[in-house]
Amino acid sequence: MFEYLNGKLVKISPTNIVIDLSGIGYLISVANPYAWSALMNTEVKIYVHQVIREDAHSLYGFVNESEKALFLRLISVSGIGPKSALAIIAAADNEGLINAIDNSDIKYLTKFPGVGKKTAMQMVLDLAGKFDATGAVGISLLDAAPAGNLALEEAIEALQALGYKATELKKIEKKLEQEAGLTSEEYIKSALKLMMK
């Protein structure tokens, strides 16, 4: 089983993205593929879940561990498969979904593709009260993007090793995030220029 993949995002299609990792392209189904567009041709970290069936081996990808945890909880419900779970995650505000489950809001739950009244009731029965305050509430892809930018992470670690404080680096991190696709060295040079201003 895989926990996550670090690789270059090389392709986006309506239902999948492709991550190139050491010359192998991994086809990964994700909730909102085009939300990954800003990270095209950059190194990303994507959390994955592998589903092995008789006729296929499939990878499902997530922005963060919370989104993956939500997916795993959803597929544990009878009547919800991996594709339905991804559709629910794509269509939902995760916090609203969790509140609907905890408050037995069947009407809200039946608005999702493939979720009828019976499945919604099963979701409430199986999942109500099983989410902690942080356990499965997702964050947006843009919030998670810096975690997926390995070159930027390496640059920040290198600057900290050189003695720069985390508070100093936090001030310029947003500006650096806007410069997608740079190497670690280029991020370091850019950071030093920003701190000299």
UniProtKB/Swiss-Prot annotation:
GO molecular function, one term: four-way junction DNA binding
Chain spans, region Domain II: 64-142
High-level lineage: Bacteria, Bacillati, Bacillota, Bacilli, Lactobacillales
Membership in a protein family: Belongs to the RuvA family.
Subcellular location(s) of the protein: Cytoplasm
Main localization category: cytoplasm
Region (Flexible linker): 142-146
InterPro entries: DNA_helicase_Holl-junc_RuvA_I, Hlx-hairpin-Hlx_DNA-bd_motif, NA-bd_OB-fold, RuvA, RuvA_2-like, RuvA_C, RuvA_C_sf
Gene of this entry: ruvA
Gene Ontology biological process terms from the UniProt entry: DNA recombination; DNA repair
Signal peptide stretch: none
Domain topic, free-text comment: Has three domains with a flexible linker between the domains II and III and assumes an 'L' shape. Domain III is highly mobile and contacts RuvB.
The protein's assembly and partners: Homotetramer. Forms an RuvA(8)-RuvB(12)-Holliday junction (HJ) complex. HJ DNA is sandwiched between 2 RuvA tetramers; dsDNA enters through RuvA and exits via RuvB. An RuvB hexamer assembles on each DNA strand where it exits the tetramer. Each RuvB hexamer is contacted by two RuvA subunits (via domain III) on 2 adjacent RuvB subunits; this complex drives branch migration. In the full resolvosome a probable DNA-RuvA(4)-RuvB(12)-RuvC(2) complex forms which resolves the HJ.
One GO cellular component term noted in the UniProt record for this chain: cytoplasm
SMART domains: HhH1 (SM00278)
Region named Domain I: 1-63
Gene3D superfamilies per the UniProt record, alphabetical: 5' to 3' exonuclease, C-terminal subdomain, DNA helicase RuvA subunit, C-terminal domain, Nucleic acid-binding proteins
SUPFAM superfamilies: DNA helicase RuvA subunit, C-terminal domain, Nucleic acid-binding proteins, RuvA domain 2-like
Keyword annotations from UniProtKB, A to Z: Cytoplasm, DNA damage, DNA recombination, DNA repair, DNA-binding
Record carries keyword Nucleotide-binding: no
Domain of life: Bacteria
Coiled coil: none
Name this protein carries in UniProt: Holliday junction branch migration complex subunit RuvA
Function: The RuvA-RuvB-RuvC complex processes Holliday junction (HJ) DNA during genetic recombination and DNA repair, while the RuvA-RuvB complex plays an important role in the rescue of blocked DNA replication forks via replication fork reversal (RFR). RuvA specifically binds to HJ cruciform DNA, conferring on it an open structure. The RuvB hexamer acts as an ATP-dependent pump, pulling dsDNA into and through the RuvAB complex. HJ branch migration allows RuvC to scan DNA until it finds its consensus sequence, where it cleaves and resolves the cruciform DNA.
